[in-house]
Amino acid sequence: MRKISSLVLALIFSFFTLPQAVADTTVTKLIAKPHQLFDGTFRNDELTNDLLPTGRLGKPLETKPKGLRTWVIDGALLDEVSAMAAGYQLNNKKPTTGQQVAQEWLSRLKLVTSGDKVVALPYGNPDIDLAKRSAPSELRLYSTYGLERVEFHLNRKISAESGLNWSTGTSKLNPLLRKKYTQNRQALTALSSIVNAPEVKAQRAKLAVLLSPSLDKKDREFFSYNAAEGVAQTLNRLRVSSGKYQIASETGKVPVTVTNDFDVPVKVAVKLTPLNSRVQVSNVAEFAIGANSRTQLSIPFTAIAPGATTVLAQITNKDGEFVGPASKLSINVTFFDSRVTYFTVGAALLLFIAAFTQTIRRIRRGRHEK
């Protein structure tokens, strides 16, 4: 009887204690739709109001919890607030009002979360199912980068618990914008195989905001096209300069400039593709370019026939994968190859002989008729 009583008491104790622990844990999410554009400026100043003590993101920091508290935070939001705190610009050039508000919000966040559990969402808070279908490897990047950024801003280690379980919502990104996302993602992935720069990794992670459920139709279109512009500018920092050249002999060397505007050295190769058979040229093997510098290559060409042609110059990595868009080298061949000359003279001579023969026949035929 005593054993039964003890068992009943134990069950009653478990019933009241375990749910209480769950009930006393407050989960606070700090997420927001993106405000910062891919060039670093801000679309508007709406985030300032959200960060105020009375705002959507400020209130949770002022509320005293009744028990334990778990914070679920998007590192992309902290990056935006940090950019505001350091001094920021609006895209429309209007005065900003949120620098001090952002500074105070970050300081308050570090203080109130210091003893609490913090879980980092995948960077940019993307739709998890859509990210898995689009690029599983990028979702892993979003998760690790999101963790890195939250730890950086809070200046401490946080829970290694996956934020995938905390992500909710469905993105309504249409097929056209999904295709643009994929193209930009692939372009930055290829660039990162050559350029090991923080800004390339950051921009690659920032593409996750395009998959965010927090964006409405207008926002999705705006940020998708803004991302394409930003990625194009980043790709242009490593480029082959287009140009016009003339070859006046059977062989000649063309000076082609390759520029690296990143703060890190890179190793690249260049694939050269003539669009017709007037010239022949070989690809350029891998070579190094220093940080923020340019290299001029002297590329040998062999001319086959006179006339104009275009050669596509494409930067590649060591595996031969294309990096960035191709540049156009306009080549004008002005010399006559001896083989072409012999062929032309021979053809003219044959035409002359044929015409002379035809004339003789006509004269003879005329005499016979008389």
Language model region names:
Residues 264-268, 309:
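Short beta-strand/loop motifs in extracellular/secreted proteins, especially
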